[in-house]
Regions:
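Short, conserved micro-motifs enriched in small and acidic residues
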Residues: 29-32, 36, 214-218, 266, ...
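A generic secondary-structure signal for well-formed alpha-helical elements
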Residues: 43-49, 53, 203, 231, ...
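Non-catalytic, mostly N-terminal accessory regions of nucleic-acid modification and defense proteins
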Residues: 1-222, 227, 296, 411-414, ...
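A conserved structural/catalytic subdomain of Rossmann-like adenosyl-cofactor enzymes
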Residues: 2-4, 308-553
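Conserved S-adenosyl-L-methionine
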Residues: 209-318, 323-339, 381-384, 392-396, ...
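Alpha-helix N-cap/helix-initiation motif
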Residues: 167-171, 212, 264, 352-356, ...
């Protein structure tokens, strides 16, 4: 089946699930995103299980009904078969199948172990919870206190009216049985990135807290292709403000999903749920145990092997929140306990506008502290960071130059993020760039404007523009008013400015003229000025005449 058809069918299924939620009064409710993402994932894991079972036992490949064939299989043989499945496949009981729920949705005679009636919505909820518990070790993420956050929770709890709970769950199961993911499992990152973005697009808006800023795929792909060139294997990738995982997923795809292990932390429960879904869809189940829900700045949870300090990572990417109120934690962050990590300082609490506290400066320092001796990093920062003349921003820039760990900077077009009007740049760090040149690029004039949701304006980069940015940066190629390569000494001579524009050569075009040509040009300019002055006097007279006709009535 063509990829376009698969995409259309998958999006239609997502839309149908959202319609069901709307029909039961759940459209736009806090619980809607949990229902949609959990039901989508239940369907995906169920179909993935059947897909992998066929690969493990070729005799099942031609079964007319794979679920019936599995149900008829002796229990010991079934258990052996599930043990043959890879670690990225959820283990399902025969009663977990979607077909089982579909076939039992109208059976009023079903009873619980204690003999009481077993309403269908309870059967549906119990199935989800049992799948989550059976796969707790593999598919869980964790809190900072190492408590496991399971894969599924009951969904009928979001329907307020008891009589409608079974109807809601029947509508869901009837929709799931119509669709199959069988054709998608051979698809790669680009397909799942598109589907994931479509799935969460209604639930990733206007959050405004840690890392819940959605990073455009263009930015993620630029970062990934600049950071990773050539073969890389057995490396670690980290994002301390991971959000839904766009940056780490793009980087993992560039490295190779089997060649890296992802580590993340984020304070947002919703972001961590989205990230888990994203990792599962992109064959990175082996990294789920490294997804932590907690405050990175106060309680960074990824420690070194001796557990006596923070872990260091080969690659770090992040689009941290730029400004937010962390006044309650400010003094603790500025204490001696964190002094080494926040070497350039911690922003003070302002008397007004606490929401404007520059928290991104702490994330930059945390990333520098967490970078391995040969590590590389890319951080999305407000463009004002590049030229700030004093304070913490300048101290950080001075440190990067002193330690010879700056690879370069790309200043992006305005409104590249639809959610913020702040101009942004990408700061690239490389601990091995001790003696190399630093690449400064001004891509702010690229892109075209488009409306998002009929409201916000966003700048979109074309494929050619993205390629130009990547190729020019990686080649270290100077280009007038676009890209320049400078030395660390050059940067020190410009007060540690990271702005490309301050290093561009100012060019004055000289044209050779004969005395006659010079006289002719000057006469032409004089004639033009005379005409403009005459027109100005005419307009002045006309305005005076019109004013003279104005009378009081």
């Amino acid at each position: 089946m063509q990829i376009e058809n698969i995409t259309i069918r998958t999006k239609r299924m997502i839309d149908d699930l959202k319609t069901i939620c709307a029909n039961f009064g759940l459209g736009g409710s806090p619980g809607e995103y949990k229902i949609i993402t959990q039901v989508f994932l239940y369907k995906y894991l169920s179909d993935k299980f059947l897909y992998e079972v066929k690969k493990a036992d070729p005799t099942l490949a031609n079964a007319e009904n794979i679920e019936e064939a599995l149900t008829a299989m002796p229990d010991d043989q079934y258990e052996m078969l599930t043990m043959m499945l890879g670690g990225s496949t959820a283990k399902l009981k025969k009663t977990h199948y979607i077909s089982y729920l579909f076939n039992h949705q109208n059976e009023e005679s079903m009873r619980k172990a204690d003999g009481s009636p077993y309403p269908f919505h309870e059967l549906f909820d119990d199935t989800l919870v049992d799948i989550a518990n059976c796969n707790l070790d593999i598919f869980s993420v964790q809190t900072g206190g190492e408590e496991k956050i399971r894969l599924f929770d009951p969904i009928s709890q979001y329907v307020i009216e008891s009589a409608k709970k079974p109807l809601f769950c029947r509508a869901i199961i009837n929709k799931l049985v119509e669709f199959s993911f069988a054709d998608v499992f051979e698809q790669k990152y680009d397909f799942f990135a598109q589907i994931f973005e479509y799935l969460i697009k209604d639930y990733n808006k206007d959050f405004g807290k840690y890392a819940e800023y959605y990073t455009p795929h263009a930015i993620a792909n630029i970062i990934a292709q600049i950071m990773v060139q050539g073969d890389v294997s057995n490396v670690t990738v980290y994002d301390p403000a991971a959000g839904s995982g766009t940056l780490v997923l793009a980087l993992a795809h560039q490295i190779g999903e089997d060649n890296c292990t992802i580590f993340t932390q984020d304070i947002s429960a919703k972001s961590n749920e989205f990230l888990r879904l994203n990792l599962i869809l992109n064959n990175l189940v082996h990294s789920l145990g490294n997804v932590v829900h907690d405050d990175t700045l106060i309680a960074p949870r990824h420690l070194n092997t001796k557990k006596n300090g923070l872990a260091q990572f080969d690659y770090i990417v992040s689009n941290p929140p730029f400004n937010m109120d962390f006044s309650d934690n400010r003094d603790e962050l500025a204490s001696d306990k964190h002094k080494e990590r926040f070497f350039a300082g911690v922003p003070n609490v302002p008397k007004k506008d606490k929401d404007g506290m520059a928290i991104y400066l702490l994330f930059i320092q945390h990333i520098i502290y967490s970078l391995a001796p040969k590590g590389k990093a890319a951080i999305v920062v407000p463009t004002g960071f590049l030229t700030a003349g004093s304070g913490i921003p300048k101290k950080i820039r001075e440190y990067l130059v002193k330690e010879r760990m700056l690879r370069g900077v790309i200043s992006m077009p305005s409104n590249i993020f639809a959610t913020t009007g702040t101009n942004v740049s990408i700061l690239f760090l490389d601990r091995e760039n001790k003696d190399g040149n630093v690449i400064l690029m001004d891509a702010s004039k690229l892109g075209t404007k488009e409306k998002v949701d009929g409201k916000n304006q966003r700048t979109v980069l074309s494929d050619d523009e993205i390629t130009r940015i990547i190729d020019t940066f990686n080649a270290g190629k100077a280009e007038d008013d676009f890209c320049v390569t400078v030395s660390y000494a050059d940067i020190e001579g410009k007060k540690h400015s990271f702005s490309a524009g301050q290093y561009f050569e100012v060019k004055i075009e000289y044209v050779e003229l004969t005395p006659e040509e010079f006289t002719e040009k000057m006469n032409g300019f004089t004639a033009q000025l005379d005409e403009m002055f005459a027109e100005s006097r005419r307009l002045e007279d006309e305005i005076r005449k019109q004013l003279g006709r104005v009378k009081y009535e």
